[in-house]
UniProtKB/Swiss-Prot annotation:
This is Medusin-L1. It comes from Agalychnis lemur (Lemur leaf frog). It is found in: Secreted. The keyword Secreted applies. Its main location: secreted.
Length: 18
């Protein structure tokens, strides 16, 4: 489950760039 944290961070950062 800890492996999904970087994916969530990258997804949030990608959404914030929109």
């Amino acid at each position: 489950l800890l492996g999904m944290i970087p994916l969530a961070i990258s997804a949030i950062s990608a959404l914030s760039k929109l």
